[in-house]
């Protein structure tokens, strides 16, 4: 069984006996060798997310979206250390369509034969996360609460959003998890570009969280 080290990201790249193999995108991300998309988070982000969970002793998390389980594994390793649990959900449309923006105008659709789902299940086995990381196939916002409640009923204290990089989807994702949050929590958003984390998203956060977010780098945190 693999364990977390400072080289875990590279260890994943070298795995060759699973349902998929992994390759470097050339930009510091990993990808499944037989698919153009999706891309994973980068190594420094992987370690950052794992350490974030441990440093704050977080217990119940939700990730949207899984992709093929690299960020999920980072989070799972953190929650394994704290004794917590995390649900990760994806519809796997980016993989099935080979296009990260294809589902912008789609209605609810899920792809239940995804290599990404097979990949995250494989990584769970490799890192001994069977009691920590729970992958679900679902569409945000429609299936968010149902998928989370299959695994725990207590409030969330962590959410990581790395799904549709366009304002209307980010607002839907935020509205889906807000009712499930506890009093204190940490939120993390990936790829917070101006065109995706727009003024409309800022306004939504201001109304729902009573604060406007200040963004920097690629992962933005909200700690409450």
Each language-model region and where it sits:
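S-adenosylmethionine/decaboxylated-SAM
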Residues: 35, 46-224
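N-terminal auxiliary segments of SAM/dcSAM-dependent transferases
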Residues: 1-14
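Short linear motifs in intrinsically disordered/low-complexity regions
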Residues: 12, 18, 25, 132, ...
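Short, flexible helical or helix-coil boundary motifs
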Residues: 1, 16-23, 208, 213
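Class I SAM-dependent methyltransferase Rossmann-like catalytic core
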Residues: 13-56
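Generic detection of intrinsically disordered/low-complexity segments and helix-coil linkers/edges
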Residues: 3, 16, 31-33, 152, ...
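Terminal low-complexity, poorly structured segments
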Residues: 8-11, 26, 205
């Amino acid at each position: 069984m693999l364990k977390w080290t400072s080289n875990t990201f590279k260890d994943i790249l070298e795995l060759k006996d699973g349902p998929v193999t992994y390759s470097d995108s050339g930009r510091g991300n990993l990808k499944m060798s037989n698919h153009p998309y999706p891309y994973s988070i980068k190594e420094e982000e992987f370690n950052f997310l794992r350490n974030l969970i441990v440093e704050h002793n977080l217990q119940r998390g939700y990730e949207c979206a899984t992709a093929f389980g690299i960020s999920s594994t980072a989070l799972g390793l953190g929650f394994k250390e704290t004794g917590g649990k995390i649900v990760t959900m994806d519809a796997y449309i980016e993989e099935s369509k080979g296009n990260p923006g294809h589902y912008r105008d789609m209605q609810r659709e899920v792809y239940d034969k995804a290599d990404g789902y097979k990949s995250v299940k494989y990584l769970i086995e490799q890192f001994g996360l069977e009691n920590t990381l729970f992958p679900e196939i679902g569409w945000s916002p429609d299936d968010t609460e149902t998928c989370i409640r299959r695994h725990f009923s207590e409030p969330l204290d962590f959410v990581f959003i790395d799904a549709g990089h366009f304002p209307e989807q980010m607002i839907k994702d935020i509205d889906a998890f807000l009712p499930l949050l506890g009093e204190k929590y940490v939120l993390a958003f990936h790829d917070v570009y101006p065109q995706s984390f727009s003024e409309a998203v800022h306004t939504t956060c201001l109304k729902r969280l009573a604060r406007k977010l200040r963004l920097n780098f690629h992962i933005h945190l909200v700690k409450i």
